[in-house]
UniProtKB/Swiss-Prot annotation:
Catalysed reactions, semicolon-separated: N-(5-phospho-beta-D-ribosyl)anthranilate + diphosphate = 5-phospho-alpha-D-ribose 1-diphosphate + anthranilate
Gene field: trpD
Name of this protein: Anthranilate phosphoribosyltransferase
Co-factor: note: Binds 2 magnesium ions per monomer.
Residues given in the record as Mg(2+) 1 binding sites: 93, 227
Entry binding sites for 5-phospho-alpha-D-ribose 1-diphosphate: 81, 84-85, 89, 91-94, 109-117, 121
Stored InterPro entries: Anthranilate_Pribosyl_Tfrase, Glycosyl_Trfase_fam3, Glycosyl_Trfase_fam3_N_dom, Glycosyl_Trfase_fam3_N_dom_sf, Nuc_phospho_transferase
The keyword Glycosyltransferase appears for this protein: yes
Function: Catalyzes the transfer of the phosphoribosyl group of 5-phosphorylribose-1-pyrophosphate (PRPP) to anthranilate to yield N-(5'-phosphoribosyl)-anthranilate (PRA).
Amino acids binding anthranilate 2: 167
UniProt subunit comment: Homodimer.
Binding site for Mg(2+) 2: 226-227
Example GO molecular function: anthranilate phosphoribosyltransferase activity
Enzyme class: transferase
Length: 341
């Protein structure tokens, strides 16, 4: 199916078959579509509304074309979210990755520079002294040695270069926001995924179900946050043993006091790093609480505990004893060794 035919199909409000979506994505990712065609495709698809089947098919293509990280670790976890929630909070899921590693997990943290926020995961990790420009084998060594490694999306998804310009110029959320958490180059089967809109909470869980994921928590809070919120109830769709369960969690269930999201807001990468370090230094407050909530959910998703509450308590313990902070410093040191070699 040629791109104009794809556009006509979408403009008529019709869904693409999985095979048509895969064919279209392969054209886009191999330079077979013009920037105008890519932009038109993304907007037409969003206006029609992406289906679970379309998103799963697109993710399959990006997974095929990614530069893989050859990690063989059971329960390998990612904490990459869709972004695009416009909350301007510090890097919560990135901070949580070090907490999960300290709790005994293996984390393949997939991320990039900021698109819609003020500090992307790559931005804050680089500011923390971590070398983000590692080879797949070097990332593998970090994960196997320390329990955590950073997979810089731009290095692993080279084919995305064709969509970067149109995506940036459009300046609105598109299919690619949904694809970020679905295309981990290490193939992490366990995930905590934040999503920018409530209808995609169960939708993304269904996509990951189709893609064969093992244990996943997809979350979106009523205040709009693409994390488990300290300020409002959070919708969770949990994929486990092939089944999806929907429920809500509230911070007070786990002994946390609600706090305004404004207390977690940052306007620079440096401010995000300061807040991250404060959490890992066990400074009390809403930043530490929201990381404990989300890291606890990730620990549970990584099958390190048998309940969300037990995961949260484990997260609090490894923050308090300094082992989570030690993981951040160890990754900075090891990644810089690679840069020097």
């Amino acid at each position: 199916m040629e791109i104009p035919e794809v556009l006509e199909t979408l403009l008529a409000g019709k869904d693409l078959s999985p095979s048509a979506m895969r064919e279209t994505m392969r054209k886009i990712m191999s330079g077979g579509a013009t920037p105008a065609q890519i932009g038109a495709f993304l907007i037409a698809l969003r206006c029609k509304g992406e289906t679970v089947e379309e998103v799963a098919a697109a993710a399959q293509v990006l997974r095929e074309m990614a530069t893989k990280v050859p990690v063989s670790a059971p329960h390998l976890l990612d904490t990459c979210g869709t972004g695009g929630d416009a909350s301007k909070t510090f890097n919560i899921s990135t901070t949580a990755a070090f907490v999960v590693a300290a709790a005994g997990g293996r984390v393949a943290k997939h991320g990039s520079r900021s698109v819609s926020g003020r500090s992307g995961s790559a931005d804050v990790l680089e500011a923390a002294g971590i070398n983000i420009e590692l080879t797949p084998d070097q990332v593998k060594t970090c994960i196997e040695t320390l329990g955590v490694g950073f997979l810089f999306a731009q290095r692993h998804h080279g084919a995305m270069k064709y969509a970067i310009g149109p995506r940036r110029e459009l300046g609105v959320r598109t299919l690619f926001n949904l694809l970020g958490p679905l295309t981990n180059p290490a193939g992490a089967p366990n995930q905590l995924v934040g999503v920018y809109t409530d209808p995609w909470v169960e939708g993304l869980a269904r996509v990951l179900q189709q893609l064969g994921s093992s244990h996943v928590l997809v979350v979106h809070a009523e205040d709009g946050l693409d994390e488990i919120s300290i300020a409002a109830p959070t919708h969770v769709a949990e994929l486990k043993n092939g089944l999806i369960t929907n429920y809500y969690v509230r911070p007070e269930q786990f002994g946390f006091r609600r706090a305004a999201l404004s207390e977690l807001a940052i306007d620079t990468v440096a401010a995000s790093l300061k807040m991250m370090r404060g959490v890992l230094d066990n400074v009390p407050g809403p930043a530490r609480d929201i990381v404990a909530l989300n890291a606890g959910a990730a620990i549970y998703a990584a099958d390190l505990t048998d309940s969300l509450e037990a995961g949260i308590r484990r997260a609090e313990a490894v923050i308090a004893d300094g082992s989570a902070r030690a993981k951040l410093e160890a990754l900075a040191a090891l990644s810089r060794q690679f840069a020097a070699s």
